[in-house]
């Protein structure tokens, strides 16, 4: 098995590595996990992609959100089983190494690199839209060429999204210095984000004109499913809950609660917001708009509330970028430590104690992509990366049930293999709705990864030594 691409890290070794001096403190309950999930989920999806989704599906966007939420729920139950039976930090990459072997772990790690890097880029584009909306409220306007990526706004010459570039580089610098994430700060930020969304609902609901909901599905089910594949981005982040397994007081009870409650709260908020948005403004007016939520309020003459929404969106999306870039470096660090990518990526700064090479490299890449590539293209690639990860996790649950039926599982996914099977079908269906261009781009990325694995990673893997 030494040279095999299917060699595995044993689950017992993974769990043993977390005990002793390097074990994490178990202090998170179901409430903390729910807020952690909501904190990671609410961001660009609700503040930005609701506009793009409305153009694709019309008022039927509400159904798109429910379809995307179902795909997430089925995958989430598989995630919860994994997290409770392999309660180790390192997310899907670690789980896959233990169950499906090294090659699949490398592919998922390579997939996560794409997902996290492009997620930071996509969120930075949304952040830029709200930041510029906030500036224009103060009478400050940037040169048009520096407001968006080339080709992002039809009929307008744009060259470079300067605010998107600057915010990612600023966050990269913060992470290079070292940042202590705290439960309290996250909980306060999340409550603030929820309040901003509730404020929008309360103020905008009175301006709804029901005739704007006709026709409900102007592009038919095709439009609804295409939008579901796009707004799936709005739910990315709930997997952050499962990666906190090591720090949860009672993983068996609290993990599934945290995952399901956070998905439920976000789905209700998303459906309500999209119904109000398409009720206030005819859906076609959202074309090319990267601050749709505040646009709705501006059109209703509620400029001061729009300003509050802009600030809330800017703060909310800053935390999402921070967590995503942090997660990116953590996956890279794990892969580098396992010998699958060059050792320099796990180099730790002598003073700041941070993986500084990985931080600066991926921070710069994310900043450039965010400033040069339009948002919907970025979002589609993030989605295909995440959906592929969900498919693999669901397959891994079925495999692990067969291969290791006696493994202690604090939480069991109900209805195996039906529920993981539904997750696989839903996710593959959404992948097909992302369009062939996105699928081909993703396959090219995977092909580059496979070349790297067979030329470098297989030889340098720690399991090979």
Swiss-Prot record:
Protein's membrane topology: Multi-pass membrane protein
Notes on how activity is controlled: Isoleucine uptake is efficiently reduced in the presence of 100-fold excess valine, leucine, alanine, threonine, serine, cysteine, asparagine, and a nonproteinaceous amino acid 4-azaleucine.
BP terms from Gene Ontology: amino acid transport
Induction summary: Expression is repressed by the transcriptional regulator CodY. Contains two CodY-binding sites in the bcaP regulatory region, which both contribute to repression in vivo and do so independently of each other. A single CodY-binding site is apparently sufficient for substantial CodY-dependent regulation, but both upstream and downstram CodY-binding regions are required for maximal repression of bcaP. Efficient bcaP repression by CodY requires the simultaneous presence of isoleucine, leucine and valine, and other amino acids in the growth medium.
Record-linked Pfam families: AA_permease_2 (PF13520)
InterPro entries noted in UniProt: AA/rel_permease1 (IPR002293), AA_transporter (IPR004758)
MF term (GO), any: amino acid transmembrane transporter activity
Keyword terms of this UniProt record: Amino-acid transport, Cell membrane, Membrane, Transmembrane, Transmembrane helix, Transport
Subcellular location: Cell membrane
Disruption phenotype: Mutant is still able to take up isoleucine, leucine and valine. Deletion of the gene confers a weak resistance to growth inhibition by serine. The deletion of the three permease-encoding genes aimA (ybeC), ybxG and bcaP results in an unprecedented resistance to serine up to 100 mM.
A single GO cellular-component term on record: plasma membrane
TM ranges: 35-55, 57-77, 103-123, 133-153, 159-179, 188-208, 216-236, 258-278, 305-325, 355-375, 380-400, 413-432, 437-456
Family: Belongs to the amino acid-polyamine-organocation (APC) superfamily.
Summary of the function given for this chain in its UniProt record: Branched-chain amino acid transport system which is involved in the uptake of isoleucine, valine and probably leucine. Can also transport threonine, and is active as a minor serine permease. May be an amino acid permease of rather broad specificity, because several amino acids, albeit at 100-fold excess, are able to prevent isoleucine uptake. Probably does not transport methionine.
Name listed for the protein in its UniProt record: Branched-chain amino acid permease BcaP
Species of provenance: Bacillus subtilis (strain 168)
